[in-house]
Design a protein with these regions (language model features):
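Conserved AdoMet/S-adenosylmethionine-binding subsite of the radical SAM
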Residues: 2-12, 17, 21-139
């Protein structure tokens, strides 16, 4: 709490990775305590662990009660290129982004431009079009 004056009214803690959603039980408990102390909370995630299957989804819903903001890393909107970059398709990440929009949880979308890997004009246009469908993206 000694750093709270430094944070101001909007500052707080950000949990990043690895992938914080792989430690969801810990993050829930940490964020519960943070909220008790009046600390803003943020998760920096690639979203890959997201699923609406149990037991993950009920834990994720609980975590969202204590989360003020998510930084969602969309590495590539094109599923095939996303799989080439990461080894996984992006369907669960897209599903997570849509769910966060449904519950109106504030999100910052992040995308790293890597020449010849994630900077294709058609994919950037598609990413922009997708972001336009979300009601919760904080610009």
């Amino acid at each position: 709490m000694r750093f709270k004056p430094y944070w101001g009214k909007d500052g707080g803690i950000t949990i990043s990775g690895g992938e914080p959603l792989l430690q969801i039980d810990f993050v829930i408990e940490l964020f519960k305590k943070a909220k008790e102390l009046g600390i803003n909370t943020c998760i920096d995630t690639a979203g890959n662990p997201f699923t609406k299957e149990e037991p993950f989804f009920s834990k994720f819903e609980e975590l969202m009660k204590y989360t003020d903001l998510l930084l969602l890393d969309l590495k590539e909107i094109n599923p095939a290129r996303h799989k080439d970059l990461t080894g996984f398709d992006n369907s669960n990440i897209i599903e997570m982004a849509k769910y966060l929009s449904e519950i109106n949880k504030p999100v910052w979308i992040r995308h790293v431009l890597v020449p010849e890997h994630s900077d294709f004009d058609e994919d950037l246009d598609a990413l922009g079009d997708f972001i336009d469908t979300l009601s919760n993206v904080d610009l």
